[in-house]
């Protein structure tokens, strides 16, 4: 069943005498699709076709590269220890990058901020500036992309694996935290279309992402993967991480769309 959660008109805005394209509307656009606009630029936008302006803002956001590596995006614990700076200084450097991006990048960073509140992590849980920066890049890269691929990518993000205990999820000691939040917070909503058995079986399919050397990237360890059969949403097989994403989006398409929409 298709879901329509749009409560307004879908008619294309056409300026006229009763509803003109003016300063108020230009500012409205940039407040909704960014964080405002320099007032000296407003005059130029007043001379633009509003629909062309919207297309331009989306094209810019879609083609914008992620924030470049500040020089420490791939540091491990040893690199941070030998840098001569404490980790708080790196975190503050990252904050400056984020604020500059907010000022300069408009729509893409507006959506990056939005998704950071959806696929949330908390820095104090892992205290790793490189993880935080790569998580930020992950949000930027997927902010206007395919939601299914976004979900696939975010679950393997080092910051997320640390924050929701994915790195502790092993075949001999499964951890259900990420499996639960994948459904409850990220895709379906609390108690909506899944059972505790689905969570338990999903956690088994997500095992194995545990290998980490000196605070470097987290990688898959097949020796810690549960390679037995699992039943998720009524489907049985030797499911793994990618299978979970495929089954979720095949079986729960409308529920996901409705949850994200509202």
Feature locations, PLM:
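Substrate/cofactor-recognition hotspot
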Residues: 2-17, 25, 29-33
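Active-site substrate-binding loop specific to GH73 endo-beta-N-acetylglucosaminidase modules
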Residues: 1-8, 73-77, 92-98, 128-262
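N-terminal accessory alpha/beta regions
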Residues: 25, 29-140
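Extreme N-terminal leader/anchor segments
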Residues: 16-20, 45
């Amino acid at each position: 069943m298709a879901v329509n959660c749009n409560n307004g008109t879908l008619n294309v805005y056409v300026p006229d005498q009763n509803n003109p394209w003016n300063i108020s509307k230009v500012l409205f656009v940039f407040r909704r699709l960014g964080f405002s606009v320099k007032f000296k630029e407003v005059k130029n936008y007043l001379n633009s076709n509003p629909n062309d302006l919207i297309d331009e803002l989306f094209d810019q956001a879609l083609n914008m590269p992620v924030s470049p590596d500040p020089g420490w995006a791939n540091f491990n614990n040893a690199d941070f220890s030998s840098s001569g700076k404490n980790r708080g200084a790196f975190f503050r450097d990252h904050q400056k990058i984020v604020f500059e991006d907010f000022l300069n990048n408009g729509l893409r960073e507006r959506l990056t901020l939005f998704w950071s509140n959806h696929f949330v992590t908390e820095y104090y849980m892992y205290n790793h500036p490189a993880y935080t920066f790569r998580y930020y890049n992950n949000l930027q890269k997927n902010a206007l992309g395919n939601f299914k691929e976004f979900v696939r990518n975010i679950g393997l993000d080092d910051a997320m694996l640390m924050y929701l205990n994915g790195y502790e999820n092993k075949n001999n000691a499964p951890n259900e935290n990420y499996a639960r939040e994948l459904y409850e917070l990220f895709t379906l909503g609390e108690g909506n279309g899944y059972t505790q058995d689905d969570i338990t079986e999903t956690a088994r399919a997500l095992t194995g992402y545990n290998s980490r050397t000196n605070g470097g990237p987290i990688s898959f360890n097949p020796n810690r993967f549960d390679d037995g059969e699992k039943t998720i949403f009524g489907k049985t097989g030797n499911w793994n991480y990618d299978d979970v994403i495929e089954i979720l989006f095949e079986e729960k398409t409308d529920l996901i769309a409705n949850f994200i929409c509202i």
